[in-house]
Regions:
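Positively charged n-region of N-terminal signal peptides that target proteins for export
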Residues: 1-5
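Catalytic glycan-binding domains that act on GlcNAc-containing polysaccharides
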Residues: 21-192, 198
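Sec-dependent N-terminal signal peptides
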Residues: 6-14
């Protein structure tokens, strides 16, 4: 019985590890989805639901967390040595803050959504970018301006020109978005084929 429980625990831990581990090559969209096939299914569903291209979803997650499900902002330090509080409540793949995540759950009815879930994170990104399209009239294909709104918020977007650091980040997202788009063109047909695999 004890041995059975140990084997069961090991199996469950292996499942959790496989589901949550960071992909080996986060710079390649085909590699990501080859390793994490169900991520492709989740991203495809979010694209169909919200209209947000898969390559933009990946580019935002790449910038925000580099696909680390437990990512958090680094703690501030007092006198550059003593660890202090974190600058925001950002967490998970999308680095959504608590307030915006709460709004997402209320708007979508996805009340059990978790910021540590890839499925919920890409749905959140789809929801957010779709609202950005409605509020700020920014096309879902405009990765540069979509990320500016994602980072600065709908209210803070108008002041982005005063923040060169954010502009540079948005350019990186735009470049990554273009790279992911080109990469996925080479493997989208194989990804769209049904697969009956666990991960």
């Amino acid at each position: 019985m004890i041995r059975y429980k140990i084997l069961l625990l090991s199996f469950l831990l292996s499942i959790i590890s496989a589901c949550s581990s960071v992909p080996k090559n986060t710079a390649d969209g085909c590699s990501i989805f080859s390793e994490k096939y169900f991520w492709y299914k989740h991203s495809k569903k979010a694209e169909k639901k919200w209209g947000t291209p898969i390559y933009l979803q990946l580019a935002i997650i790449k910038m925000e967390s580099d696909f680390d499900w437990l990512a958090k902002p680094q703690r501030q330090k007092i006198f550059k040595v003593i660890p202090y509080k974190r600058p925001s409540s950002s967490f998970g793949y999308s680095q959504a803050v608590k307030g915006t995540w709460k709004q997402y759950k209320e708007d979508t009815g996805n009340k059990f959504a978790s910021r540590a879930s890839y499925k919920d994170s890409v749905d959140f990104i789809g929801w957010y970018t779709n609202k950005t399209k409605s509020i700020l009239k920014i096309p879902l294909t405009d990765a540069f301006r979509q990320y500016l709104a994602y980072h600065e918020g709908w209210g803070g977007y108008k002041n982005y020109k005063n923040n060169q650091k954010v502009i540079l980040l948005a350019k990186k997202v735009e470049n990554n978005s273009n790279k992911y788009k080109k990469q996925l063109e080479d493997c989208i047909s194989s990804l769209s084929t049904k697969r009956y695999i666990l991960f």
